[in-house]
Amino acid sequence: ATYSVKLINPDGEVTIECGEDQYILDAAEDAGIDLPYSCRAGACSSCTGIVKEGTVDQSDQSFLDDDQMAKGFCLTCTTYPTSNCTIETHKEDDLF
């Protein structure tokens, strides 16, 4: 399946298509969108976003704890969409 992922960036909103087996960060890059990242392995917080609507699978990440995920935080480098969703990007500072 392919889902529509709406990214709310500091400079505006854009909607991309993302396959259920594709990380959101990779799909954004394929669409020419520059999102922050560092490790690309789900082990740091550089690419943090907040899921505002929809559902995601981020079982590949190892950085966020259950409380942070319950608040909607996700690491876009290791997050797959499981529905159409909306994600606010550039949210690393909100984690701490």
From Swiss-Prot:
Its main location: plastid. [2Fe-2S] cluster binds at residues 39, 44, 47, 77. It comes from the Eukaryota. Binds 1 [2Fe-2S] cluster. GO terms for cellular component: chloroplast. GO terms for biological process: electron transport chain. GO terms for molecular function: 2 iron, 2 sulfur cluster binding; electron transfer activity; metal ion binding. The keyword Transport applies. Its cofactor is [2Fe-2S] cluster. It is found in: Plastid, Chloroplast. The keyword Chloroplast applies. PROSITE patterns: 2FE2S_FER_1 (PS00197), 2FE2S_FER_2 (PS51085). InterPro entries: 2Fe-2S_ferredoxin-like_sf, 2Fe-2S_ferredoxin-type, 2Fe2S_fd_BS, Beta-grasp_dom_sf, Fd_pln. Keywords: 2Fe-2S, Chloroplast, Electron transport, Iron, Iron-sulfur, Metal-binding, Plastid, Transport. Residues 3-93 form the 2Fe-2S ferredoxin-type domain. Signal peptide: none annotated. Ferredoxins are iron-sulfur proteins that transfer electrons in a wide variety of metabolic reactions. Belongs to the 2Fe2S plant-type ferredoxin family. PANTHER family: FERREDOXIN (PTHR43112), FERREDOXIN-2, CHLOROPLASTIC (PTHR43112:SF3). This is Ferredoxin. It comes from Euglena viridis (Cercaria viridis).
